[in-house]
Curated annotation (Swiss-Prot):
This is dCTP deaminase, dUMP-forming. Transmembrane segments: none annotated. It holds the Pfam family DCD. Keywords: Hydrolase, Nucleotide metabolism, Nucleotide-binding. The gene is dcd. It comes from the Bacteria. Pathway: Pyrimidine metabolism; dUMP biosynthesis; dUMP from dCTP: step 1/1. Homotrimer. Residues 163-190 are annotated as: Disordered. DCTP binds at K101, S102, S103, L104, G105, R106, D119, T127, L128, E129, Q148, Y162, Q174. The record marks G116, F117 as: Important for bifunctional activity.
């Protein structure tokens, strides 16, 4: 069940749902707007001949921070990692779904390529997979509204929420745009 603005406020007031920093004006009818942090991970296109999800490739991305008061410019066809300004903490019976903002999508900005789902129990900054599919550069301003977090109530609390030892929660507690850790649980079939 998708939570309404009333349900979202009740979850915040009960201390079960966390967004830090919290701004009540960001609550929408069935979501909460999230804002863009000031850190980005850009791909180093000359360090590797290809990306291999089975291998640890520490130098695949570099952390970039625009000068204060300046935007990050995302050029056509580029892909970078960003993060939400807010640290998100979900209880074991709520899951999240990150969606893009319609107004930004109409400019050619994709907020996430594939990983828009946030497991119950997750706590950390949400990594964004930002792509510019327009034919002009797009300026990304730290602090701008970048997406909306929809919250879904599970039919029962998760037995092993994200962050529990049984799940192998490699992104729990992440701060800033976190590079892929796919190599940690990559399985090759024979």
């Amino acid at each position: 069940m998708l939570l309404s603005d009333r349900d979202i406020r009740a979850e915040f007031q009960a201390g079960r749902l966390g967004l830090d920093p919290f701004d009540d004006s960001l609550i929408q009818p069935s979501s909460v707007d999230v804002r863009l942090d000031n850190l980005f991970r850009v791909f180093n296109n000359t360090r590797y001949t290809h990306i291999d999800p089975a291998q640890r490739q520490d130098d695949l991305t570099s952390l970039v921070e625009p000068k204060e008061g300046e935007p990050f410019v995302l050029h056509p066809g580029e892909f970078v990692l960003g993060a939400t300004l807010e640290r998100c903490t979900l209880p074991d019976d709520l899951a999240g779904r990150l969606e893009g903002k319609s107004s930004l999508g109409r400019l050619g900005l994709l907020t996430h390529s594939t990983a828009g789902f946030i497991d119950p129990g997750f706590s950390g900054h949400i990594t964004l997979e930002l792509s510019n599919v327009a034919n002009l550069p797009i300026t990304l301003w730290p602090g701008m509204k970048i997406g909306q977090l929809c919250l879904l109530r599970l039919t029962s609390p998760a037995q092993h929420p994200y962050g529990s030892s049984q799940v192998g929660s490699k992104y729990q507690g992440q701060r800033g745009p976190t590079p892929s850790k796919s190599y940690q649980n990559f399985v090759k079939s024979n």
